[in-house]
């Protein structure tokens, strides 16, 4: 670490902040109001602006990029084994919790998993339409033939963090489901292939993913994508693909 960086126990933070003086940078998008008040009470002059640590962290270096690739290849192997397992299960024998436990087991079997990236989202049928749904013993639904099964999951590895969403048709589904799936896939392909000039923001590219749905009078109320940490938070800013994102997209993000 740089000579100007000091590491201290979290328990010492309040005392250290109370002892500060002079000008202190505060990021209004992430600083808790209690910390802001503490600094003001200490007599600090607050300078509001982006956290200077966030952007360098978001732009991965060559080691982090190589680690991310390795982590994704490892995680993809576990995901492929899981999907093969799911395809081989007899119809009408699984619940959402069964699916979650199986997927986490395949990631554990890599021998490199440190933790899951977040509580696995596994929604069968109507539960798949609930944004950030988390299955519980009370909400646990049987996976039925004809369901769309949405699975949003990821793994934390020393060399990288993953976050992958897949929607699986459990047997035959209707034309409306096929159309929605296809249009989302078209948006994903468009985003994967797009090349853009330097200086564009997440909001400038977000529409490429939505355009196939817009053609059918459809849309989704949440963002399209987000940054991912390197063995850190699975949601890492400041970059996002959403209507509201004003962050310029930079190499390494």
Residue ranges and their predicted role:
Residues 1-253:
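Active-site neighborhoods and metal-handling regions in enzymes and metal-associated proteins
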């Amino acid at each position: 670490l740089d000579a100007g960086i000091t590491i201290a126990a979290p328990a010492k933070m309040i005392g250290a902040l109370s002892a500060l003086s002079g000008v202190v940078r505060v990021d209004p998008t992430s600083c808790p109001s209690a910390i802001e008040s503490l600094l003001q009470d200490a007599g600090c002059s607050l300078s509001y602006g982006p956290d200077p640590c966030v952007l360098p962290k978001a732009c991965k270096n060559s080691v982090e990029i190589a680690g991310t690739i390795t982590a994704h290849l490892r995680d993809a192997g576990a995901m492929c084994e899981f999907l093969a397992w799911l395809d081989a299960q007899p119809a009408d024998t699984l619940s959402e919790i069964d699916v979650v436990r199986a997927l986490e087991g395949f990631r554990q079997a890599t021998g490199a998993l440190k933790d899951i990236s977040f509580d696995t989202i596994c929604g069968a049928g109507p539960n798949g339409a609930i944004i950030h749904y988390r299955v519980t013993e009370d909400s646990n639904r049987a996976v039925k033939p004809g369901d769309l099964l949405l699975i949003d999951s990821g793994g934390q590895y020393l060399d990288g963090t993953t976050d992958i969403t897949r929607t699986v048709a459990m047997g035959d589904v209707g034309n409306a489901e096929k159309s929605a799936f296809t249009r989302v896939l078209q948006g994903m392909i468009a985003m994967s292939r797009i090349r853009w000039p330097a200086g564009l923001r997440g909001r400038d590219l977000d529409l490429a993913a939505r355009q196939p749905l817009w053609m059918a009078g459809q849309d989704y109320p949440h963002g399209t994508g987000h940054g991912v940490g390197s063995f850190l938070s699975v949601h890492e800013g400041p970059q996002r693909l959403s209507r509201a994102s004003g962050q310029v997209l930079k190499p390494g993000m």
